[in-house]
Amino acid sequence: MPSHKSFMIKKKLGKKMRQNRPIPHWIRLRTDNTIRYNAKRRHWRRTKLGF
């Protein structure tokens, strides 16, 4: 990835960075909760973004 990024690429990278985090702990504590972890976590070396 070049150091001079276009704004659109930078915006997409920022969104993917925000998506790639664990779920908040208080969500796990809610009643009738089935979500245990973020199924869409992405590792930077295993799965590439494709742009």
UniProtKB/Swiss-Prot annotation:
Pfam families: Ribosomal_L39. Residues 7-19 have a biased composition (Basic residues). The keyword Transmembrane helix does not apply. Residues 1-21 are annotated as: Disordered. One of its GO terms (molecular function) is mRNA binding. GO terms for cellular component: cytosolic large ribosomal subunit; plasma membrane; vacuole. Belongs to the eukaryotic ribosomal protein eL39 family. This is Large ribosomal subunit protein eL39z/eL39x. It comes from Arabidopsis thaliana (Mouse-ear cress). The gene is RPL39A.
